[in-house]
Design a protein with these regions (language model features):
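C-terminal non-catalytic regions of proteins with extracellular/luminal or membrane-system context
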Residues: 1-207
Length: 207
């Protein structure tokens, strides 16, 4: 019998919830996923340099000389991500957007959150949705100044982490490797962190 490696997300950095992604309920131009359009200037002006489509959560960075997309510069570029969410059920969902430089989230043309920052900043936008209704979601991004460039986005419904269920899935497994620790996304001098267990960027407990 061959060895098998199984990954399970046991916990979040600070959140006791896990996100069930609704990206499978998103489409644009009749095709599933998110459409990204790229410009090699910060103003999204002129002809785009390229575009692509993804059905995965957005997770891009220029660290390690990676580019956001085909033919895109490492600096002074911009992106427009767009999709339409048609939820299968009514309720409250989370739009989780994290980035550095300039980024803005719009729903049906309304700005929900906007940041221009040199440090990676996490945002959580709660949205009440109705089953079958269309919600146009746009993310505008630009690398500005000499700041780093990174962006993450996912949306969906949050559920409490079920630790008992996670433990039950370990039956029959010989070795468990837990990977955890602190994160520079949360812990740094005078960082604007407003969540339990922190005072600014200083951790007050680690339970």
């Amino acid at each position: 019998k061959k060895n098998q490696i199984v990954y399970m997300k046991g916990c979040d950095l600070v959140n006791d919830q896990t996100l069930e992604s609704y990206l499978d309920q998103c489409n644009i131009d009749g095709k599933p996923g998110i459409k990204a359009t790229f410009w090699n200037n910060p103003e999204r002006q002129g002809e785009p340099v390229s575009s692509l489509r993804t059905t995965q959560p957005i997770n891009v960075t220029t660290y390690g000389l990676h580019t956001f997309g085909p033919g895109v510069n490492l600096e002074k570029f911009s992106v427009k991500y767009e999709t339409v969410l048609i939820p299968k059920e009514s309720g409250e969902i989370l739009l989780n957007l994290e980035g550095c430089s300039y980024f803005e989230l719009l729903v049906n043309g309304k700005s929900m959150t906007k940041h221009r920052t040199w440090r990676t900043t996490d945002t959580r936008t709660m949205l009440q949705v109705e089953k079958g209704k269309e919600y146009k979601i746009e993310i505008l991004y630009a690398q500005v100044e000499n700041w780093a460039a990174n962006l993450k986005f996912n949306l969906g419904k949050e559920f409490p982490i079920n630790y008992s269920e996670s433990i039950s899935k370990l039956k029959g497994i010989d070795v468990v490797v837990f990977v955890g620790g602190i994160s520079p996304q949360l812990e740094g001098e005078e960082m604007p962190v407003n969540i339990p267990g922190f005072k600014g960027g200083d951790r007050t407990d680690i339970e």
